[in-house]
Every structure is written in C-alpha cells, then in structure tokens.
Swiss-Prot record:
Transmembrane segments: none annotated. This is Phosphate import ATP-binding protein PstB. It comes from Rhizobium meliloti (strain 1021). Its EC number is 7.3.2.1. Keywords: ATP-binding, Cell inner membrane, Cell membrane, Membrane, Nucleotide-binding, Phosphate transport, Translocase, Transport. The gene is pstB. Belongs to the ABC transporter superfamily. Phosphate importer (TC 3.A.1.7) family. Part of the ABC transporter complex PstSACB involved in phosphate import. Responsible for energy coupling to the transport system. Residues 24-266 form the ABC transporter domain. It catalyses: phosphate(out) + ATP + H2O = ADP + 2 phosphate(in) + H(+).
Length: 271
C-alpha cells in the first residue's frame, strides 16, 4: 500500500487548489473616502467555489474591500474606487454595468440580521419577483422552498411562512437573510461578519451552512474570529492599514505565514 506522507498530501492539496479558476479578480484596487485613502493598490483574486476569509484588525480595510466586490461603496457619499475588479470577464465598475443586476450576481449578508418587515415567505420571494426569476406562483413557491432548504431553515419555518421574519430568533433571521440572498441565484455571496451577533449554537449552524453553500457558490467572508476563518475557509487574505499583507491557503496562513505581521495578528499580539 502506497501511503502518502503528510508533506506529499499537503503539496497535492495545494496543487489542486491552485488549479481552481478565479471568479473575481481585483487589480490595484484603491478606495478613497473624500481625501482619506482607505485601501492601497490591493491585488486579490477570488477563487471559484471557494470560501475566502478576509482577516485583519479593526479598520484595516477588509470590509471596505468586501464592499467593492458588489459596489456597495456606491451608497457612501464621497467614496471613490480606482483600479479594476472583474466578475468572470466583466469589469464591474464599467459605466455600462447594471448595478442592480450586479448585486443579484454578487449577493450580500450583513453583520446584523436585517430581514425585511415582511413575512418569511415575502422575504425570500422578494428578489425573485423583482428580477423576474419566477413566472408563476408555483415557481415562486418552489424558489422559496429551495432557498430555505439551502439555508437550512425550511424544516423550522415551513408551517409558518406567513409569519413575520422579524419574529425569528437571531440565528434564524441570519439564515433567512442567507436564503434571501441565494433566492436570486447569485454567483458570489459576500458575508460581512455574519456571526458576530449570534450565539455559539447559531454560529455553528451558519458555519455548517457555509460549508454546504460552497458547492454552488463562491463565498467571501469578513471575520474577526481567527478560529472561524480557520474552520470555514480554504483561502485567507490578511489586511493591515489598508494594505493586503498576504493571501494564501488557509492552512498555510495559520501554520506558516510569509509575513511577520500575519503571524503577530494570528497570535494575538495586536488587533
């Protein structure tokens, strides 16, 4: 029996990860809030069907970069983005890009659960309705059920779909928001600290869900939890003072990072 050494297994996994195509490519991305520069020439590529974690101390630019990926920064007055970001081969900052369509392709789950003040059913069906993804009530019903199943919530709410989404627990509300995001069949899902307001049990459910969603979606997650980044991601990018310090396979980042700043942050020497 040919038993591969641990080093050989690690090398094989690295080679396999390196063959995964890029879904989004960021070239020399800088962000300005008025005269203040928040990101400095970031070059970061996001691999398809992979969970990429963005880590770093508060104010380092990780959430700012995340918001550039679906142009959420457009909603901030005096915010300016330079450089280039492509989704497949589409330049998402090209003037011809429909931003509403872009945000259907690149969905977002925020730090605090933010269900609409509508029923559970309407929370999930809203996106497919406005984007014309369901032509009949039967098709809409199917999208709602499938999305809630993907979010691991269907069995908990299937008998109360007309109750308000705001009546769910915090963890359930966050999974409802994930169901709402996947209902429009995005290609990428962005998550900005999706578990920071949740208890450990709800966090575990969301993390399990992230593992399952990776089969069908590309996921980028901002997290302050090193343990969470290590558990859920395959790639990790470290930000500091608006700069991308390094990006690599998660296992390598947490065991043998290339930059001392990454080592210091992971070890809790600053944060």
């Amino acid at each position: 029996m040919n038993i591969m050494s641990e080093a050989a297994v690690e090398k094989a996994l690295d080679q396999k990860m390196n063959t995964v195509p890029y879904k989004m490519i960021g070239n020399d991305v800088s962000v300005y809030y008025g005269e203040k520069r928040a990101l400095f020439d970031v070059n970061l590529n996001i691999r398809e069907n992979t969970v990429t974690a963005l880590i770093g101390p508060s104010g380092c630019g990780k959430s700012t970069f995340l918001r550039t990926l679906n142009r959420m920064n457009d909603t901030i007055e005096n915010c300016r983005v330079t450089g280039k970001i492509t989704l497949d081969e589409d330049d998402i900052y090209d003037p011809s890009i429909d931003v509403v369509e872009l945000r259907a392709r690149v969905g977002m789950v925020f730090q605090k659960p933010n269900p609409f003040p509508k029923s559970i059913y309407d929370n999930v069906s809203y996106g497919p309705r406005i984007h014309g993804l369901a032509r009949t009530k039967a098709e809409l019903d199917e999208v709602v059920e499938t999305s809630l199943q993907k979010a691991g919530l269907w069995n908990e709410v299937k008998d109360r779909l007309q109750e308000p989404g705001t009546g769910l627990s915090g963890g359930q509300q966050q999974r409802l928001c994930i169901a709402r995001a996947v209902a429009v069949s995005p290609e990428v899902i962005l998550m900005d600290e999706p578990c920071s307001a949740l208890d450990p049990i709800a966090t575990a459910k969301v993390e399990e869900l992230i593992h399952e969603l990776r089969a069908n979606f590309t996921i980028v997650i901002v997290t302050h939890s090193m343990q969470q980044a290590a558990r859920v991601s395959q790639r990790t990018a470290m930000f500091h003072l608006g700069n991308l310090v390094e990006e690599n396979d998660t296992d390598k980042m947490f065991t043998n990072p290339d930059d001392q700043r990454t080592q210091d942050y992971i070890m809790g020497r600053f944060g």
